[in-house]
Amino acid sequence: MALTKADLAENLFETLGYSKRDAKETVEVFFEEVRKALENGEQVKLSGFGNFDLREKNERPGRNPKTGEDIPISARRVVTFRPGQKLKARVENIKIEK
């Protein structure tokens, strides 16, 4: 099971008494701010949760798994997430059911 934006909005509705419309808009605004910051090359630091960073990946050699042909994997920018200490501590001993 995955946590969705709809789940987050529902939680705001239930715990803070937001209207459903305001809860959904709040979640959308939050994620839009994160997107904008990353698009502008900024780090996103969420205290007690973790950091989102942009990393540049250089071009590197790769291989087509079907044909075995060598192909270059182009340089690109990727988003990485590094969990903070508080998040790590909270999930450290959780048993995951499959």
From Swiss-Prot:
Gene3D superfamilies with a match to the protein in the record: IHF-like DNA-binding proteins
Region (Disordered): 53-72
Highest taxon of the lineage: Bacteria
SUPFAM superfamilies for this protein: IHF-like DNA-binding proteins
Basic and acidic residues: bias regions: 53-69
MF term (GO), any: structural constituent of chromatin
Keywords attached to this entry: DNA recombination, DNA-binding, Transcription, Transcription regulation, Translation regulation
InterPro entries listed in its UniProt record: Hist_DNA-bd (IPR000119), Histone-like_DNA-bd_CS (IPR020816), IHF-like_DNA-bd_dom_sf (IPR010992), IHF_alpha (IPR005684)
Alphabetized SMART domains for the sequence: BHL
Gene Ontology CC entries for this record: cytosol
GO-annotated biological processes: DNA recombination; positive regulation of metabolic process; regulation of DNA-templated transcription; regulation of translation
Protein purpose: This protein is one of the two subunits of integration host factor, a specific DNA-binding protein that functions in genetic recombination as well as in transcriptional and translational control.
Subunit structure: Heterodimer of an alpha and a beta chain.
Family recorded in the similarity comment: Belongs to the bacterial histone-like protein family.
HAMAP family: IHF_alpha
Record's protein name: Integration host factor subunit alpha
